[in-house]
Amino acid sequence: MDFLNSSDQNLTSEELLNRMPSKILVSLTLSGLALMTTTINCLVITAIIVTRKLHHPANYLICSLAVTDFLVAVLVMPFSIVYIVRESWIMGQGLCDLWLSVDIICCTCSILHLSAIALDRYRAITDAVEYARKRTPRHAGITITTVWVISVFISVPPLFWRHQGNSRDDQCIIKHDHIVSTIYSTFGAFYIPLVLILILYYKIYRAARTLYHKRQASRMIKEELNGQVLLESGEKSIKLVSTSYMLEKSLSDPSTDFDRIHSTVKSPRSELKHEKSWRRQKISGTRERKAATTLGLILGAFVICWLPFFVKELVVNICEKCKISEEMSNFLAWLGYLNSLINPLIYTIFNEDFKKAFQKLVRCRN
């Protein structure tokens, strides 16, 4: 987003020559990140468009997120690279206004898309039956439109406030002269969505964990009922005894006398059922860990990429004595841009349908 750059007019030719290798390295690194972001998001968009199996309202949100991140890669990153390498804005104030507008709107829209996806997943888990009827392409379209409209409303006011200050021709930044404007832009674009995402994904994890445990308990009860066998004990009446209980008893207490118990208790079928139950429990635990890992990656990437930048924005613009170096400011801005590269990876890498679609696209290219 907006970051401060200084002019290199006061530098001597020798100093400029000495700094050339580092500038080339920075230029190549940032250009590589921009190219990767463009390619991966383009791949996600293409996969969703050409693969019929991916034509689902939930994936339309992911496609819209990929479009937003694609715009960041092709309309925001290249100008930022030139600005950083040149250390001054050389493209005029008209293009500066346009670049800042696209930068703020697209980055805000990308963040709000993450909130919309979190809300969509939360409703799909907690209100599956009712939400399945509402989860239509039209509903996804309304959600996407709402996200873009909110992004514009959050992003436009800071652009108007920018013109209240005296901007230099060689700078392309937004000066937050008012605390109100700083709080409005940072809370609207990041802090409120962050709180919403944290709450939703916490509830999603709890709901998913409860669902796994309920399914596991239901399977165990079903196997208990299906595994009951008839036993005879002298002149006593016939009783129903669970085979899984007998197997657990035999493992926990080897001294137990099972000679009087019917031989079917130790039958291979009973042992097979117990083994199957254990495997299901293991699979359920694996799925729970996978869900936790996925949610952790989503939240971790979002917080790591954007939190430092917005903390800097809040602190620097509220505290007049607080300063930050040009290099650190640029680094934090690009750390935020990096989220546009990570998003398509996280939201598709754990989906088998996306994996197959990507493999198909790569094979077609070859």
Swiss-Prot record:
Glycans are attached at N5, N10. Pfam families: 7tm_1. SMART domains: 7TM_GPCR_Srsx (SM01381). The chain crosses the membrane at residues 25-49, 60-81, 97-119, 140-159, 179-202, 292-315, 328-350. Keywords: Cell membrane, Disulfide bond, G-protein coupled receptor, Glycoprotein, Membrane, Receptor, Transducer, Transmembrane, Transmembrane helix. GO terms for molecular function: G protein-coupled serotonin receptor activity; Gi/o-coupled serotonin receptor activity; neurotransmitter receptor activity; serotonin binding; serotonin receptor activity. The keyword Glycoprotein applies. Residues 50-59, 120-139, 203-291, 351-366 are cytoplasmic. Serotonin binds at D103, C107. Gene3D superfamilies: Rhodopsin 7-helix transmembrane proteins (1.20.1070.10). Residues 1-24, 82-96, 160-178, 316-327 are extracellular. InterPro entries: 5HT1F_rcpt, 5HT_rcpt, GPCR_Rhodpsn, GPCR_Rhodpsn_7TM. This is 5-hydroxytryptamine receptor 1F.
